UniProtKB/Swiss-Prot annotation:
DNA-dependent RNA polymerase catalyzes the transcription of DNA into RNA using the four ribonucleoside triphosphates as substrates. The gene is rpoC1. This is DNA-directed RNA polymerase subunit beta'. It comes from the Eukaryota. Its cofactor is Mg(2+); Zn(2+). PANTHER family: DNA-DIRECTED RNA POLYMERASE, DNA-DIRECTED RNA POLYMERASE SUBUNIT BETA. It comes from Nasturtium officinale (Watercress). Zn(2+) binds at C69, C71, C87, C90. Gene3D superfamilies: 1.10.40.90, 2.40.40.20, RNA polymerase II, clamp domain, RNA polymerase Rpb1, domain 3.
Amino acid sequence: MIDRYKHQQLRIGLVSPQQISAWATKIIPNGEIVGEVTKPYTFHYKTNKPEKDGLFCERIFGPIKSGICACGNYRVIGDEKDDPKFCEQCGVEFVDSRIRRYQMGYIKLTCPVTHVWYLKRLPSYIANLLDKPLKELEGLVYCDFSFARPITKKPTFLRLRGSFEYEIQSWKYSIPLFFTTQGFDIFRNREISTGASAIREQLADLDLRIIIENSLVEWKQLGEEGPTGNEWEDRKIVRRKDFLVRRMELAKHFIRTNIEPEWMVLCLLPVLPPELRPIIQIEGGKLMSSDINELYRRVIYRNNTLTDLLTTSRSTPGELVMCQEKLVQEAVDTLLDNGIRGQPMRDGHNKVYKSFSDVIEGKEGRFRETLLGKRVDYSGRSVIVVGPSLSLHRCGLPREIAIELFQTFVIRGLIRQHLASNIGVAKSQIREKKPIVWEILQEVMQGHPVLLNRAPTLHRLGIQSFQPILVEGRTICLHPLVCKGFNADFDGDQMAVHVPLSLEAQAEARLLMFSHMNLLSPAIGDPISVPTQDMLIGLYVLTSGTRRGICANRYNPCNRKNYQNERIYETNYKYTKEPFFCNSYDAIGAYRQKRINLDSPLWLRWQLDQRVIASKEVPIEVHYESFGNYHEIYAHYLIVRSVKKETFCIYIRTTVGHISFYRELEEAVQGFSQACSYDT
């Protein structure tokens, strides 16, 4: 469909019977209205032509061959002569055969049937709106019991038994047998209601605004009562409140979209265009048919049988009529969603029929495989690897992929700069991989974002835009912080690259889809760009160090490789003196010169506020110098004091990994603060 803003879109929802009839019916030039499928036949076994009023009827769905009717007559399509535009003998219009891809038909159901998606799927929308248990509604739909109608004070059959609603289980066999078909219809239409028609009546009587008001009042009352002290009762109250919220949201959605609740019960069943459920002839003259055709045939057979029972037969028991209505309901359920009520229906080879739900849902369904998963131009695909040196909003594209994606832009750049006279010369330069080609490619990529998508796209962060840069190799480089949004890791995952072409798409990619603009989860608001995968391992290795404290490391034989300034005593103990550094640059320089390791403990001079130091903490050791100065050694810091107990300096006990991690955090915070100050 196309909305008022000329956006092509697809929407799945409920439609009225009038809308279904408008889609499926058409008036041929002689004034006859066609569109209803009344026969369960497909092709005639002798002539191999579609049966009239059948599932492949050319009067309803259009000719099989363009401009040729069922009789074999031919007319030129679009001819402005006064010849009739349809065959007066067979009633087939002379139109293009492509009409069979979108022209629908319909089946007029003798009895209403509920749409199984809205009854059996969780949550059950019909049960939520009616505020009744799902099992009770199922028993009503499949004619297991009935409801009593509120009628006038006239004498009724049900008054003989009082409350019919609670005694129907013992009466469900006696009542249909008591009446003939004609009498049973009078009785049922006047005093009881059963089947999908009962659901339709109850849905039609609903006032959605009153439902919202009553649900809100009940929700407030439950909230004011507070906990009862009984855990089971409290859970029931919480579940009831959640149900009321869902019911109000559902009623608001029906009001907002102008959908009537009774549309969840079908009176007209749409028939798909025949090209979407084809019958194909294979080798040996055998025919292969779509499973949907067989399911449609079953619906038509049972619907016609019910019509015959109600119109031709006068002595059929009412129970048989109710049984046939149940069969029609089950046939429509199987057509829409096979197996939703239990065991799926199978063919003669014990193969499960593919229903309408099976055709459209899942990885191999119509949407994901044909509409979303099909190959498109200006797209590529490759394995992703980590790019730790990339910025958050950048991705690395291999040269092979980039030159294919941006080939048209590179050709235009070569021609504009008079480096190529025509498209053929430009393509030859690209094939030869001349240096000027890569320069123009980099210029093009600087102003053109790309979209990265990882299947399955379960939320909007499954597609994000990045600024591409050229990298060597044949893999796509990705910043590890964006992995959580894609639910990706680097164990062989693949991602697709798409190039937005229109200005609107590029603007949307820059303003809404850039990775650095999607730092929070749109669902719950939690940070989505958090360290994962290799970043967590790297941070752990960087900041691990030793966990056993200063006492355990005084004479630790495991630290033999940590230091160059080591002293060995005759007592077989190894004393490892921890080095002192005045600043972080000296410590990192010593690490680069391989004088210390990444996790080697060291003392770093630091400007530490003494108010942070606990006054009750007692030093582990005190070292005195010859001039009276002394060192107070604590678990994580060291204080150098004079004879007069004045503090000269403070050292903290850390590692090179901690120093590097702190410097990275400090630079990031300073850069963020500067960016915020520029914005303000």
